[in-house]
């Protein structure tokens, strides 16, 4: 899995011992790593001595190691104990507990309370650094005076004083550098701690959120908190010291400036004060824009996340353009604000960056105007102070902008952490009370704040206890799933009480699968017990499936269960519950996704067998199982209408009887005898005898069964094409203009300083000439002053142009990259999404895009500024002191190697940091999808620990990267300080010939080199790391793509297809090149308007036919023709828009009801209402506020699953296609609704060619013909009645497996079709009675295997297992897993899957049978 792919397994316990040879190799590797000090060892920093810690020398060997080896996560030291997530979580929890009691809690205050000592320590070091900065200008002034006196011959100082000055300047600079980088490291560590605790607390809170809070907070918004908002903290705290000390530095600089040049200082101060209001206005606007900007970002990420989760449905419906438009609109709104934000930020930078130049020009002009002279010592000391002033002033706008963002981010985090949490269900500890669920006089709602608008359960009295099976039934929207959720504590209790005794296991209606092996999904963190595990596989009918996977139960399932069919996912979910050995089992319609014979097996061997000693609560649509339940609860409109035993309810002749009639069950034929099928039950028991083997940890790793692709990771330097991509994507000419302005800006600033030195030199010469009675030469002082002011003002204008041009460019580039990325993903094939975790993709749209949006501009602009400044500095110093070129050559060589080693290390660390970040988001997305299961299974703490583990792996990359930054910075400062030292040295040697002005200019520039060289190098590295985001985005932009959406030369006619005939011509399909085909030479002809049923066992290829027809997977060989036209020649959009499908998984999107059924707004209101009436949702829609424009929440959570399925039918009705595919289309609705839907399909699609993939055979027995698939081939294809005459046929076997009564009913349906009789007149089967014991003599162990003559094992490989791509039949949740559905008798009713949010109900005790 993801973390293992980048070496995380080195830090986890290895549960798979493997062969001795592997262990020996591993031991050698570990010994080698320990020898060099990496991989699992304690932090090198934590174990270093004081000098090594102070100078970051502990990282030397690591840098060399990174150069020699491709860096892996396992090579990096473990985090220091004080950096680990567990420690940080404990610290912030204590602080937040104090803060939350205050009237206005603040997460930032809590963070300062938790980590305040680190801030103090950081400030201590930074204060020493700040003080050391002022030593240089003082020494510079003395050095100029020393040279002047030496040249004039009146010096009384020690001739060696220049050397002493050089040593003092070097020493003070080195002390400052050491303190600076320690301060930086502590600040970076503190920022990372804050990011970590935000991620930890947001994750912890997300698991605990109440349902009403979750309804108002989308996953995209929460992901933003963990990525963008948390990242803001890191960025601010990296620069916090610059912000804290900016004002003190400015004040000290001004004081020293006043001492040097007197009152002209106040002229500069006045200019600075005049700029304050403008800074304030810009800062206020930035705050306002940023507050709105994060909201638009949240919306964009939320919509993107929703689209990516449902990408398969969008492709099937050819809705890419509609959803692209929605995302682009939200992105454009975001970009509009981003432009505004960038322009105000540019304005703030211009004001602040121009201040040093403007102040210099104004101060020196005033100085000359008042004193009529230029003193070299004072002027260049002042110039050094102004250069020092440049840094805090330059950082001010950055800190202001980041501070604004941090404030907003902190408030968002605080608001989120203050959201209401789910209240734990009352736990009953009284040993005299039996295990079970107890609800008394309860009124419950989904959203307490909007209880009028949300579904409510009223007057609920429910009890399920002891060794009983209680079934909950009701029509679509009656409240079955809601009652199930109420038992789990997921609904708000308005009145009454909900209590529980014992531990709970929960099986949701839509199975939640984690991205791990099948075995891990079943164990779910529980200890491994071989005997119990094997028993669970048997009763959950998983043995045969596991045999077909090449890796067995170690097969990697993939994200969202992509490698399994819908039925397989549900059986894994049931197996997880059974293995947990809980006291109470709450099952929400688990049989809807499985075949009838598998459902039979699960009910009798699992629910009534192995769980017979447990309390089992089962919400279901399969009424044929009701006679076997101890109690039945009937729900209607959110209330319990009846309760009691099956026979009691029949005798009452109330709501239950009407429900049976709606389902088509003949109650009069039901036998009252409800004797238990004891022989079945007694064969199963979850208690494992003590003689079983001791428990052992399961093998978590599987090297062969990897489905999820390893995240791409480039090696070496970021390729030049990535830079070129960024330069050209936003408009190459604009970038070129901005770059030219950068060069002109540095050139004019340098010229201003040089001109001042030249003016001083000429002024001194002219003064000497006048003293000797000679005429002064050259320009007058007034002219020098005019040029000085003119060039200075020009420099300010160029700086403004540079900033506005460059920020304009970066926003354009960001817009283009997003659009290209999103469009590329919309056009990516399904195989890409099946093998790429959603969290990894979302990471591109959050962290990576945020880097391009907000950080790239600052990073590149600062690099260009510092780099050009360093080049200019070296040129100036070398011209003035040519001898400096001698030591400069080796210094440059050392510099080259230092930055080379650093860049190699830092970019690999950055890539590892990015790769190790994705699993955090993947795990988070996975957690949000299964939060109810996590709560029910009491796995909150285990998941929190997993989050901590993944966060620690990410943090050790980040902190090591920060340590590398300080390691390099200190060594670069040493080189820069050596340059200053040698400059002083050569000036001292050459003091009799060099001018004082040149001394001042050289040393003032040399002093600035220390910081500038380091910043230029770090910004170069930072720019490269930011380019990693562009690289990662571009990797997806250049990824695999589907065929063209439109082929202009092959556009179909407007009325295509005219008839709807389909021909499969020797169709061969495989999911990826090199894999075995899943369809093997499919050939058949389907006539226009023909109704075709498609059945087959799991893995037979049913869903693969759908994928091939819609070209989600392209044919490897052969062709599919529609009305004689090869579909391969059409564009995908033209093809898919002319087909229709009702998928098994009903998906709704946030927006309006209208947008969900008519996204292109092509139909009139009357048409929409007419369709809603056809699907029995007219009254429901009318009752909603807004009607057609009523709100649909994310994932359609405010509609039940059954209602969502009906809306999918509405989409097909509106499309009015010639070809319709039904992929188990009525699995999520009750029997009555199923009958209505089938009637609607027969009526409204009578002129359509219909392909029906079915688990429930009653839905296809009225088909004109049935295709029976077996191992990717057509085993049988004929009329239903004809196929049933073959006793050895696969269809005949499947029919027989539904039980005697249902088999007879299915045969009557087939005969009615043959005889032309209306099938609605055929009497459905009655419910089976226990004395029939239909399973008593059944060969349960072979229930999944048809007759040998009709299905050979070697001909039936599981396509999902063979192709670990996840694109398979499996991932479609497709009925792949079992095709004929529902037990013995529920014909239509068997419509299984009624997952309505609202549909839960449950009531158990027979004693209260007559209450209602």
Curated annotation (Swiss-Prot):
Gene3D superfamilies: ABC transporter type 1, transmembrane domain, P-loop containing nucleotide triphosphate hydrolases. It comes from the Eukaryota. Residues 119-405, 735-1025 form the ABC transmembrane type-1 domain. The keyword Nucleotide-binding applies. Residues 1342-1351 have a biased composition (Polar residues). SUPFAM superfamilies: ABC transporter transmembrane region, P-loop containing nucleoside triphosphate hydrolases. Residues 439-662, 1062-1296 form the ABC transporter domain. Keywords: ATP-binding, Membrane, Nucleotide-binding, Repeat, Transmembrane, Transmembrane helix, Transport. The chain crosses the membrane at residues 115-135, 161-181, 236-256, 261-281, 346-366, 379-399, 724-744, 787-807, 854-874, 875-895, 967-987. ATP binds at residues 474-481, 1096-1103. It is a multi-pass membrane protein. Residues 1-34, 1316-1412 are annotated as: Disordered. Residues 1367-1397 have a biased composition (Low complexity). Residues 1398-1412 have a biased composition (Acidic residues). The keyword DNA repair does not apply. It is found in: Membrane. Belongs to the ABC transporter superfamily. ABCC family. Conjugate transporter (TC 3.A.1.208) subfamily. This is ABC transporter C family member 3.
């Amino acid at each position: 899995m993801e973390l293992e792919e980048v070496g995380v397994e080195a830090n986890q316990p290895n549960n798979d011992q493997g062969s001795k040879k592997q262990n020996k190799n591993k031991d050698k590797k570990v010994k080698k790593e320990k020898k060099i000090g990496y991989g699992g060892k304690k932090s090198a920093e934590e174990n270093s001595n004081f000098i090594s810690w102070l100078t970051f020398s502990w990282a030397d060997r690591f840098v060399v190691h990174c150069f020699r080896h491709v860096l892996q996560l396992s090579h990096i030291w473990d985090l220091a104990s004080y950096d680990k997530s567990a420690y940080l979580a404990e610290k912030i929890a204590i602080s937040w507990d104090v803060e939350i009691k205050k009237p206005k809690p603040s997460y930032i205050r809590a963070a300062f309370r938790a980590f305040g000592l680190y801030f103090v320590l950081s400030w201590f070091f930074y204060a020493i650094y700040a003080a050391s900065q002022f030593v240089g200008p003082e020494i510079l002034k003395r050095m100029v005076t020393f040279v002047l006196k030496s040249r004039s011959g009146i010096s009384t100082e020690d001739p060696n004083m220049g050397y002493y000055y050089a040593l003092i300047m070097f020493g003070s600079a080195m002390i400052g550098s050491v303190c600076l980088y320690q301060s930086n490291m502590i600040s970076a560590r503190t920022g990372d701690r804050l990011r970590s605790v935000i991620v930890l607390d947001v994750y912890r809170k997300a698991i605990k959120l109440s349902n009403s809070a979750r309804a108002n907070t989308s996953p995209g918004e929460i992901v933003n908190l963990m990525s963008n908002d948390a990242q803001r903290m890191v960025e601010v705290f990296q620069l916090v010291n610059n912000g804290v000390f900016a004002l003190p530095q400015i004040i000290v600089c001004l004081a020293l400036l006043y001492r040097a040049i007197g009152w002209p200082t106040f002229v500069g101060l006045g200019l600075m004060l005049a700029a304050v209001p403008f800074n304030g206005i810009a800062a206020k606007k930035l705050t306002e824009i940023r507050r709105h900007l994060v909201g638009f970002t949240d919306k964009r990420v939320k919509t993107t996340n929703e689209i990516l989760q449902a990408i398969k449905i969008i492709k099937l419906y050819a809705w890419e353009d509609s959803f692209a438009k929605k995302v682009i609109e939200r992105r454009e709104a975001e970009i509009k604000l981003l432009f505004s934000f960038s322009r105000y930020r540019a304005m703030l930078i211009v004001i602040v960056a121009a201040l040093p130049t403007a102040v210099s020009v104004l101060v020196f002009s005033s100085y000359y105007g008042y004193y009529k002279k230029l003193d070299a010592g004072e002027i260049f000391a002042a110039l050094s102070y102004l250069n020092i002033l440049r840094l805090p002033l330059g950082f001010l706008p950055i800190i202001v902008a980041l501070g604004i963002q941090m404030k907003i981010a902190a408030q968002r985090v605080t608001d989120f952490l203050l959201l209401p949490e789910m209240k734990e269900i009352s736990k009953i500890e009284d040993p005299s009370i039996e295990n079970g669920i107890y609800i008394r006089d309860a009124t419950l709602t989904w959203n307490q704040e909007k209880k009028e608008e949300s579904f409510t359960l009223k007057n609920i009295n429910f009890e399920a206890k002891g060794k009983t099976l209680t079934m909950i039934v009701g029509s679509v929207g009656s409240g079955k799933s809601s009652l199930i959720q109420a038992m789990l504590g997921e609904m708000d209790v308005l009145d009454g009480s909900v209590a529980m005794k014992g531990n709970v296991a929960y099986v949701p209606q839509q199975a939640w699968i984690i991205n791990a092996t099948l075995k891990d999904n079943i164990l779910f963190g529980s200890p491994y017990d071989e005997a119990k595990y094997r028993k669970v596989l048997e009763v959950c009918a998983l043995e045969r499936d596991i045999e077909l996977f090449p890796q067995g139960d170690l097969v990697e399932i993939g994200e969202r269960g992509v490698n399994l069919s819908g039925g397989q996912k549900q059986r894994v979910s049931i197996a997880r519950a059974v293995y947990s050995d809980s006291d109470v089992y709450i099952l929400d319609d688990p049989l809807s996704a499985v075949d009838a014979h598998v459902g039979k097996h699960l009910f009798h061997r699992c629910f009534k067998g192995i769980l017979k000693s447990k309390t089992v609560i089962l919400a279901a649509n399969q009424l044929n199982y009701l006679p076997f339940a101890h109690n039945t609860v009937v729900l209607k409109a959110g209330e319990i209408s009846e309760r009691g035993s099956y026979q009691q309810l029949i005798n009452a002749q109330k709501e239950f009887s009407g429900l049976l009639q709606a389902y088509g069950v003949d109650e009069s034929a039901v036998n009252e005898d409800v004797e238990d099928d004891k022989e079945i039950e007694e064969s199963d028991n979850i208690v494992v005898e003590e003689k079983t083997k001791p428990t052992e940890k399961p093998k978590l790793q599987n090297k062969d069964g990897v489905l999820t692709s390893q995240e791409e990771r480039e090696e070496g330097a970021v390729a030049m094409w990535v830079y070129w991509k960024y330069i050209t994507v936003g408009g190459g000419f604009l970038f070129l203009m901005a770059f030219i302005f950068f060069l002109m800006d540095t050139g004019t600033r340098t010229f201003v300083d040089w001109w001042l030195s030249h003016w001083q030199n000429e002024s001194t010469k002219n003064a000497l000439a006048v003293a000797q009675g000679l005429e002064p030469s050259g320009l007058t002082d007034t002219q020098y002053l005019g040029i000085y002011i003119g060039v200075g003002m020009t420099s300010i204008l160029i700086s403004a142009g540079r900033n506005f041009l460059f920020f304009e460019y970066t926003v354009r580039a960001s817009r283009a990259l997003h659009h290209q990325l999103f469009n590329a993903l919309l056009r990516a094939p399904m195989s890409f999404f099946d093998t790429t975790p959603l969290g990894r993709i979302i990471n591109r749209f959050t962290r990576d895009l945020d880097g391009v949006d907000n950080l790239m501009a600052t990073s590149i602009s600062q690099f260009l500024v510092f780099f050009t400044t360093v080049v200019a500095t070296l040129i100036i110093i070398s011209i003035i002191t040519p001898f400096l070129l001698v030591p400069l050559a080796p210094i440059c060589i050392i510099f080259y190697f230092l930055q080379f080693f650093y860049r190699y290390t830092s970019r690999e660390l950055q890539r590892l940091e990015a790769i190790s970040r994705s699993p955090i988001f993947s795990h988070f997305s996975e957690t949000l999808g299964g939060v109810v299961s996590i709560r029910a299974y009491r796995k909150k703490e285990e998941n929190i620990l997993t989050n901590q583990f993944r966060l620690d792996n990410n943090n050790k990359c980040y902190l090591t990267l920060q340590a590398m930054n300080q390691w390099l910075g200190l060594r670069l400062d040493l080189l820069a300080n050596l340059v200053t030292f040698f400059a002083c040295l050569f000036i001292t040697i050459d003091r009799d010939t060099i001018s004082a002005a040149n001394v001042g200019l050289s040393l003032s520039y040399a002093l600035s080199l220390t910081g500038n060289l380091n910043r230029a190098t770090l910004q170069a590295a930072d720019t490269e790391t930011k380019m990693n985001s562009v690289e990662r985005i571009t990797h997806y932009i250049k990824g695999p793509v589907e065929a063209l959406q439109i082929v202009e030369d092959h556009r179909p006619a407007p009325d295509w297809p005219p008839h709807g005939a389909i021909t499969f011509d020797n169709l061969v399909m495989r999911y990826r090149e090199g894999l075995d085909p899943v369809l093997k030479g499919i050939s058949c002809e389907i006539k226009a308007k023909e109704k075709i049923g498609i059945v087959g066992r799991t893995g037979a290829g049913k869903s693969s036919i759908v994928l091939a027809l819609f070209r989600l997977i392209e044919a490897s060989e052969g062709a599919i023709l529609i009305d004689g036209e090869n579909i391969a020649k059409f564009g995908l959009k033209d093809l898919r828009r002319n087909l229709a499908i009702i998928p098994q998984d009903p998906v709704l999107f946030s927006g309006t009801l209208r947008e969900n059924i008519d996204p292109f707004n092509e139909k009139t209101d009357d048409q929409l209402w007419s369709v809603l009436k056809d699907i029995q949702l007219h009254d429901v829609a009318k009752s909603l506020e807004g009607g057609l424009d009523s709100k649909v929440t994310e994932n359609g959570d405010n509609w039940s699953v059954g209602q969502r399925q009906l809306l999918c039918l509405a989409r097909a009705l509106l499309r009015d296609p010639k070809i319709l595919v039904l992929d188990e289309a009525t699995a999520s609705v009750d029997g009555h609704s199923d009958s209505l839907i089938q009637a609607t399909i027969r009526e409204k699609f009578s002129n359509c060619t219909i392909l029906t993939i079915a688990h429930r055979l009653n839905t296809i027995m009225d088909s004109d013909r049935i295709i029976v698939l077996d191992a990717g081939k057509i085993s049988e294809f004929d009329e239903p009645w004809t196929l049933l005459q073959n006793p050895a046929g696969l269809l005949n076997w499947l029919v027989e497996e539904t039980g005697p009564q249902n088999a007879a009913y299915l045969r009557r349906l087939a005969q009615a079709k043959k005889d032309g009789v209306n099938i609605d007149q055929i009497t459905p089967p009655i419910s089976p009675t226990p004395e029939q014991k239909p399973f008593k003599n059944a060969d349960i162990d072979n229930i999944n295997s048809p007759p040998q003559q009709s299905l050979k094992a070697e001909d039936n490989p599981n396509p999902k297992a063979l192709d670990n791509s996840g694109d398979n039949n499996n991932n479609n949740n497709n009925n792949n897993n079992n095709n004929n559905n529902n037990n013995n008798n529920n014909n239509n009713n068997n419509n299984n899957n009624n997952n309505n949010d609202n549909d839960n109900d449950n009531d158990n005790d027979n004693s209260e049978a007559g209450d209602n």
